[in-house]
Amino acid sequence: MLQAEPKTRHPMPDAILKLHSGRNLAYAEYGDPAGLPLFFFHGWPSSRLQGEILEKSAMKLGIRVIAPDRPGIGLSDFEPNRRLIDWPCIIEELAQHLGFDRFHLLGLSGGGPYALVTARALPDQVLGAMIVCGAPALAEFGKEGLLWAYRLAIWSQRNIPFALALGLRAAGWAAGRALNEWPMSWFSKLYPAADREALSDPLHHRVMMLSSRQALFGDAQALTHDGLIYCADWGFDLSKIAVPVHFWHGDADANIPLQLAQKTATAVPGAKFTIMPDDGHFSLPLLRTEQILRGIIA
């Protein structure tokens, strides 16, 4: 049986923007509706619903969070042959729709590259970017130390894509189980202590798993395409980023090794890199949210 958990708070209804391309872009809003604009880019596999992890701190600090679904994820329409460098135009269009002249970015895990490419492409509009547990430039720096599940997904997509599609559905089912139920009880043993503590909070667990299930039970082709973007050439030069970028990474991150994150950060001129002792891939964004967001309003 699924464990009863508290409902997530959804302050604003999901919104849909019809892009100039004719495709629909879905997004959710969190935090202070009159606050400082911040685009939140979700991880992989995840969705706009992950933005709720910022809700409490964003409301407290006066930040308005806009969390879009990437194409083909959640409620957004799929865009075949999409590249990482196609993302900034989508965000620019969304910003114009919302009336934002300037804004901040926060990329979590797989959302990190999307924040970096947007910072590169829109220097006159981006005030700064936060990269939290960010995915590294795999084509440039390699995959050594990357979580085994990520490496398996990359290999499967290239060799037996039908098996990956089945695996993603199975992962969606697993994400619906409580932490003390199989198979989550087994997977949780692979997490560092800080991650287990963070996910033991029923609300944290529900937000993270619900956002993942939204992606995992969606279009498998879109999700795998989104994943393959990370290991392809990103299509832009990190050294050309001209806005402030602050990387945050836990030294106990079992998903994305610290050394790969550091290599990516080193390629960004003037980037700040904060190492959080004992934090993992989940505890950092779930338990240190206010500390991270305070860096935006400082």
Locations of regions flagged by a protein language model:
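The serine-hydrolase catalytic nucleophile loop
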Residues: G43-K56
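Conserved alpha/beta-hydrolase
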Residues: A58-D77
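Conserved hydrolase catalytic core segment
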Residues: D101-G145
